[in-house]
Amino acid sequence: MYAIIKHSGKQYKVSEGDLLNLDHFAAEKKSIVEITDVLAINDGSLKVGAPFVEGAKVVLEVVNEGKDKKVVIFKKRRRKDSKQKRGFRRQYTRVKVTSIVA
């Protein structure tokens, strides 16, 4: 059984027991979060919502919060001795899918 959920403008394909790194949101460690924005669900037969599947939800448990590896943005203009180096680390909330309710 799997579901396709929408969270903070992105879509994720999830199954029970999966670990996901979602964009950072305010939640306590070990807290339970329910997502009702389920775009599609497959439990033997595919149900596609318009835009969301009615009555479906995905229950998540917050595992921890953290930062991804650093991404380096480097810009250089040739022959001008002009360069710019900048780093970025995305903050995420790691969650575990505990159940999918159709």
From Swiss-Prot:
InterPro entries: bL21-like, bL21-like_sf, Ribosomal_bL21, Ribosomal_bL21_CS
UniProt keyword Ribonucleoprotein, yes or no: yes
Protein name in UniProt: Large ribosomal subunit protein bL21
Source organism per UniProt: Campylobacter hominis (strain ATCC BAA-381 / DSM 21671 / CCUG 45161 / LMG 19568 / NCTC 13146 / CH001A)
Subunit note: Part of the 50S ribosomal subunit. Contacts protein L20.
GO biological process, one term: translation
Family indicated by similarity: Belongs to the bacterial ribosomal protein bL21 family.
Annotated function: This protein binds to 23S rRNA in the presence of protein L20.
